[in-house]
Amino acid sequence: MTKTYLKAALALAVSMTTLVSVAHAQGVRESYAPVTNDMVLNPPAEEWLSWRRTIDNQGFSPLDQINRDTVKNLELAWAWPMADVGLQETAPLMHDGVLFLQTNNNIVQALDAKTGDLIWEFRPALHKVPAEWGYQLYQSRRQKNSIALYEDTVVLTTVDARIVVLGAKDGKVLREVQAFDVEKGYSYTVGPIVVNNTIISAISGCSIAGTAGGCYIAAHDFNTLEEKWRFNTINDPNNPDQQASWGEVPPENRWGGTPWATGSYDPKTNTTFWGIGMPAPYAELVRGSETGDVLYTNSTLALDADTGELKWYYQHLPRDNWDLDSPFERVLVDVEEGGETKNLLISVPGKNGIFFALDRNTGEYLWSQETVVQNVVSRIDEDGTVHLNEELIMTALGEAPMICTSVSGGKLWQAGAYSPLTQQFYVPLTEACNTTEATQSEFTAGNATGAMKFGPRVLPEGITEAGLVDAIKVGVTKSEGEGWKSRQRASMTSSLLATAGGLVIGGDAGRYVKAWDDTTGEVLWQQRLNAPIGGYPMTYELDGDQYLVVPTGFSAAAGSIASAFPEIPIPSGTGNSVFVYRLSKQ
């Protein structure tokens, strides 16, 4: 691909970098050392270098100073209001005493991780789109996942479909490329993986009218930003089965297949794993795919990291008719069983809330387990074939079946965490149902092609609590009766963090950050903050002290089912902040 630099935007972007010249910040900048490739693959225990700390996406920290016994002694070390109002799904990173934050509108801030002092701030000049492009404006202002640290840089994917490389010490733009066409509707809501001098990320906006025919995972050279490969998630000419799965729908009339969450990477096999979202239009009645599975939507893809070649795929929800996308984090774990090590990929990939365990070397289905109330999947065969409840598939306009879970339920973008110490996967979930009704809609620039009307989100019959943390025992085979569930009225609105201190940490729409015992599910500590807990809690150690970082702010998850717990009001405004705790010195 020809490299296209936006020189005018680059000049403006540089002018928007604020560098704070205070003595302490200057010292932190001067001591900052490059993040090597080996560090990305094996990060120091005290640091958090990638979206989920390690690029297997486990979300686990080996730190244990904050533990079951000491968590009650947490106190606030410092707090920081994030740069802009709006939706907040930040994933903080920490290296060499610098805490990096990215919030909406692609603003990146570098803070002293010990004091909370600002070191630098980067505010990009973003491409302007018309106000009537409502869906694109909404999606492009919610940056999921993260930036990435590599060598002496911060790698950023932007809402206007650029890849930008910043200097980690000063936030100045080093290079950038327009990776996809923002005028068609493409945007990045997914942070990158950077490994082996390659930036791997995935584009979003693929259910917007102008993006028909292509949704992509792509790799760029870290040093030159030239494209190395791209993989189309809804049009694979090398796979006749994939083409046939869309029925008579030609590639130019296909939408969807967005990889909404950052993938994982296995260095042993040089494989990157990505989850793929729903098709569009959402109902086959409108999209014209008849009873086809519409590959590779709602699938896990295993790609060669050097070439982008497809190694295998597994489809978790074929023939989606309800916007129950399955793109969320794919987690790589190794488990011992029968004297052998088995390489697994585990995930609760989507909104129907079903847990899957796959052999990550072959894609073989091993087992699955339901977590929340769902009525869409009727059964899964021993070979992994997924069967649907045909009664819920709309066959005429005006039909409005009740679907559980809902478009806002089950597993959403909030990531789970896996502890290798307990061999459990901890998942934040939401119980919810809604009706779905297919519509005939005109597709306009900058707006979605879903063509569906969703009813109010309600709790499933017999369920009185929206929020759920489910601890799932992970093995080669299913373990009946192991693990635990912790239910609560308010929905879960943050990702989870697991630590060697025996804790699982996350929070909810009711503004509570909580620490659960990772073996029993007992809540050991909680504190109410200024706004719903959001983003991705994380932890690091600096100068002998372990710190816990808790982001807060409003996200799409915060209000999606708030009517189910009216006694817990959600504050107006956003309250986008980070609260940083450490153990009391008293």
Task: Identify the residue ranges that each predicted region occupies.
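Loop/turn-rich, solvent-exposed surfaces of beta-rich toroidal or solenoidal domains
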Residues: 334, 429-431, 461-522
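Short, conserved, GDST-rich strand-edge loop motifs in beta-rich repeat architectures
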Residues: 201-216, 274-294, 400, 431-462, ...
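Repeat-blade elements of multi-bladed beta-propeller folds
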Residues: 48-52, 87-107, 135-163, 187-209, ...
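Blade/loop signatures of beta-propeller domains
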Residues: 27-76, 233-240, 388-392, 458-459, ...
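Beta-propeller blade signature
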Residues: 214-226, 290-309, 358-363, 467-475, ...
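Blade-level signature of beta-propeller repeat domains, shared across WD40, Kelch, NHL, RCC1
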Residues: 538-586
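N-terminal cofactor/phosphate-binding cores enriched in small/glycine residues
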Residues: 57-179, 498-499
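Extracytoplasmic beta-rich repeat domains
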Residues: 80-93, 121-151, 176-191, 232-262, ...
